[in-house]
Amino acid sequence: MNLTRNFLLAIVILLTVSPAYATVYQYFDEEGTLIVTDNPFGTKKPTPRPDIAYPDIKLRYRDDVSYDFYPVTGNNFVELISSTNLNGPLDPADRKKYAGQTKWNTGWSYAFNSSYTIDGTYMYVSLNILDIEFMSDISVLLPVLQDRTTLSNYDLILWDHFVQKLLEHEHDHVKIVKDPVYKDEAVKKISAIKQLRLAYNPGDNLDTLIKGAVESETLRIGHDLIMKIKQQNEEYDRITDHGLQAEMSAAFFGN
């Protein structure tokens, strides 16, 4: 009887508390691929090309977005649109060029503490994930005139209107990325991670093992989240024909 009792005590280690909190940083590109880890500053924000200045028109910029510009030239509005079609950014999804482009990375940081029970070859982990914070880096690429002096006032009015409508379309993509519904869903799923069962090896560093397992769980959540955002962006471009049918924007957002 005592031998059996001692044997059971040898294979079951009762509750052990992890000695410290752990902090995780995860950032994802538009394909849901992990691009930065253990970096409290997130991804590096893009900076505008030094040889390209902000357009000499009043556009409604956002403080939470970075802007970059590519040059276009022409003697009238039609030539400017042709230059935009020639020099605009390439969409890797359909290999077509468009007048504007929104690029984004998003992710989060969170802290967690843990306790665990080891039973034979398995470790049963109890988790408390907290302090979940979201971060995103969003950049918008727009065309900018190299020389406004060669254009008539009428062509300038047409061009300025075109760029403003283009910016509004790209800002709708920003709106999709920043929709709080995705943040709320992710927080709910991350916070729901309360228990893990992990294979245990006596030679393992338990803190490293637990942290890696938690990161794997939230990595899956992050990938699924990015895929939903990407799908919404693609659907928005489909419905609005990449901004050519701007009147469909209100229907998409339910306004």
Residue ranges and their predicted role:
Residues 1-8:
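Bacterial N-terminal signal peptides that target proteins for export
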Residues 8-16:
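Bacterial N-terminal signal peptides
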Residues 17, 21-160:
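Short, cationic interaction patches enriched in Lys/Arg with P/S/T/G and frequent prolines
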Residues 30, 43, 171, 247-255:
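Post-signal/leader-peptide non-cytosolic segments of secretory proteins
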Residues 159-174:
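Short alpha-helix carrying the canonical HExxH Zn2+-binding catalytic motif
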Residues 171-188:
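Catalytic Zn2+-binding segment of zinc metalloproteases
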Residues 192-201:
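RING-type zinc-finger domain of E3 ubiquitin ligases
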Residues 207-255:
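Active-site or metal-binding loop neighborhoods of secreted/extracellular toxin and effector enzymes
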